[in-house]
Swiss-Prot record:
Organism of derivation: Beutenbergia cavernae (strain ATCC BAA-8 / DSM 12333 / CCUG 43141 / JCM 11478 / NBRC 16432 / NCIMB 13614 / HKI 0122)
Names of the cofactor(s): FMNH2
Keywords from the named record: Amino-acid biosynthesis, Aromatic amino acid biosynthesis, FAD, Flavoprotein, FMN, Lyase, NADP
Pathway terms, separated by semicolons: Metabolic intermediate biosynthesis; chorismate biosynthesis; chorismate from D-erythrose 4-phosphate and phosphoenolpyruvate: step 7/7
Reactions catalysed, as given in the entry: 5-O-(1-carboxyvinyl)-3-phosphoshikimate = chorismate + phosphate
Pfam families per UniProt: Chorismate_synt
PROSITE patterns per UniProt: CHORISMATE_SYNTHASE_1, CHORISMATE_SYNTHASE_3
Annotated NADP(+) binding sites: R40, R46
Subunit composition and interactions: Homotetramer.
The protein's name in its UniProt record: Chorismate synthase
Gene Ontology molecular-function annotations: chorismate synthase activity; FMN binding
């Protein structure tokens, strides 16, 4: 079974991630992982941290000479800012006198919409520093690193490729009939300041972010992930926890600030009658069985149906609002303004990259459940055997 785990704090020495269960023989390098992490730093409206932060990637285990070895893969992402935080974030006890100053000051004015206050309550902290350090979206760098490894397996074992893009920033949305990007469009998307596939919409999104920044505010939006080349039958209908759409929704909702997920046309289908909500089946001119439309987003009954997988995630505005929302000071109980940590105005573009990584991990997990394999070559052979066994009338 493919599984993953991450550890580390936002301003700690490093983030660490482990991916267990991936077959041997997958081609992957630190450069490829570093490139994926660089994509996570893209996007108009990012904070100052993105301009000087660098992700120092080291593969600590599971990869030799550019090939996975079949054992757990361990990735370390070093924090170039660590020397500035070494005392504040030290693992061992430090002299309280050494914590005087801005970085070491207790954070007792929790931010509305963030994990701060509830995290303090749940874990018994008297300030928010331990909470925000782990709850920070910086942690997603770990998942992007692992997602890049999973994406390499998907492409090499099954020819599956993914792409993500931004479809809305605040009230500005791409047209419903806008063209969908393909994996061949990744470079063009990454060159766009918003990672939006529609140029006119992208320009309007930039203007919306500028307005929010001038107002001392933040913005959310909607991202979409597409997976091309998926075989039918990944996932299952026999138990709720094996349904692929439920698993995708779970990992996407697990991304910081994501508050909603839809597969295919999702919430829009709720306003339609059944005759206009489902994808009719036909035999195409090439002889293959296909759906005339893809309102289901490539998933029916909790399983891939051979069409393009299409999932969206809605991100709320960042909770670190520059103009500071009302809160309380937990040290005194008095009314106060929330703390303002260095933050972004809009982080929807990087959220798309994180969502892409999480979709890759779940799809790799589902593919391995279906075809198995201790090497990527064996997984590919097993997939070919499965596809060849599908009755001709159902292909």
């Amino acid at each position: 079974m493919l599984r993953w785990l991450t550890a580390g704090e936002s301003h700690g020495p490093a983030l660490v991630a482990v991916l267990e269960g991936l077959p041997a023989g997958v081609e992957i390098t630190t450069t490829q992982i570093g490139d994926a992490l660089a994509r996570r730093r893209l996007g108009y409206g990012r904070g100052a941290r993105m301009s000087f932060e660098r992700d120092e990637v080291r593969l600590l285990g599971g990869v030799r000479h550019g090939l996975t070895q079949g054992g757990p893969i361990a990735v370390e992402i070093g924090n170039t800012e660590w020397p500035k935080w070494e005392t504040v974030m030290a693992a061992d006890p430090v002299d309280p006198a050494a914590l005087t100053g801005a970085r070491g000051a207790p954070l007792t004015r929790p931010r509305p919409g963030h994990a701060d206050l509830i995290g303090m309550t749940k874990y018994g902290f008297d300030e928010a520093r331990p909470v925000l350090e782990r709850a920070s979206a910086r942690e997603t760098a770990s998942r992007v690193a692992l997602g890049r490894v999973a994406a390499a397996f998907l492409e090499q074992a099954a020819g599956v490729r993914l792409v993500s893009h931004v479809v809305a920033i605040g009230p500005v949305s791409a047209p419903d009939d806008a063209d969908l990007p393909t994996p061949d469009d990744v470079a063009a998307l990454d060159a766009d300041p918003i990672r939006c596939f529609d140029a006119a919409t992208s320009a309007a999104m930039v203007a919306e972010i500028d307005d929010a920044q001038k107002a001392g505010d933040t913005l959310g939006g909607v991202v979409e992930v597409l997976a091309y080349g998926l075989p039918p039958g990944l996932g299952s209908y026999v138990q709720s926890d094996r349904r692929l759409d439920g698993r995708l929704a779970g990992v996407l909702m697990g991304i910081q600030a994501i508050k909603g997920v839809e597969v295919g046309d999702g919430f829009r289908t709720a306003a339609r009658r059944g005759s206009a909500a489902h994808d009719e089946i036909e035999r195409a001119t090439d002889g293959r069985v296909r759906r005339r439309t893809n309102r289901a987003g490539g998933v029916e009954g909790g399983m891939t149906n051979g069409e393009v997988l299409r999932v969206r995630a809605a991100m709320k505005p960042i909770s670190t609002v520059p103009r500071a929302l009302d809160t309380i000071d937990t040290a005194t109980g008095d009314a106060a303004k929330a703390i303002h940590q260095r933050s972004d105005v809009c982080a929807v573009a990087p959220a798309a990259v994180v969502a892409e990584a999480m979709v890759a991990l779940v799809l790799a997990q589902a593919l391995l459940e279906k075809v198995g394999g201790d090497s990527v070559a064996e997984s590919a052979r097993n997939l070919t055997s499965y596809l060849e066994a599908i009755p001709e009338q159902q292909r």
